[in-house]
Amino acid sequence: HLIRPMMYGANHFIENISNPNDIERYYSVVGYICEIDTFANNRKISSISPGDILSFSNAGAYCFSMSSNYNSRYRPAEVLYIENELKIIRKREVFEDLIKNQVEINL
């Protein structure tokens, strides 16, 4: 859903906000869609464990407006991380969001 890195190489600062002070290691950060879903290659990030939350900084408003429901994937929630607090600013999509504008027709 963050298409900018794949489309034109936009570089977003990625931080492990679950474990920000651990030793830094090199990671490739990828998504769950098979085609060109790579956010960063060989990026230095604090040690990552399953369940950690990664923050993509300086993403801006275009990230949502450029997102899609490719492969019927729900758009994730948007979360603002400010003053050590997580605030949901857009809810995660659900199945009903994918079909709400579809119209049933009888052929």
Label the model's feature ranges.
Residues 1-107:
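Charged (often Lys/Glu-rich) extended helix/loop segments that serve as interaction or gating elements
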